[in-house]
Amino acid sequence: IEAVYNYGDEKFEPYLYMGDRICLSDNVHISCVSCLILENDILIGSKVYIGDHSHGSYKVCSPKIEPPANKPLGDIAPIKIGNCCWIGDNAVILAGSEICDGCVIAANSVVKDLKVDKPCLIGGVPAKVIKVF
């Protein structure tokens, strides 16, 4: 679990909030440079990654090739996961995701820029709403 204040020459003011009764399994990686909110009573499976940023932008062609770790962080956007959610093993939750109370994120899903306002099952690559409860 990390709140990143500095990365290379970049400075950040991360806000990382973790509510009560969050159950973390093994090898969970949570990384915040902007805003990451995990509400109460969340079950997080093994090998889950939750991060509000990525390593660099790959949208623009650049003649300069450099190691990914040297690129400035990009794609920065808040993440919020509501109360009583269950995140399955190997799920990846990326920038811009807003998951409401009572949702289940299926194992091996990749959630990016998904905004959900009703309790539901979310799954797939890229993740989408599979079933509303």
Located regions from the model:
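Flexible, glycine/small-residue-enriched loop-and-beta-strand segment within the central core
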Residues: I1-I93, V125-P126, F133
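C-terminal/domain-terminus segments
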Residues: V92-A127
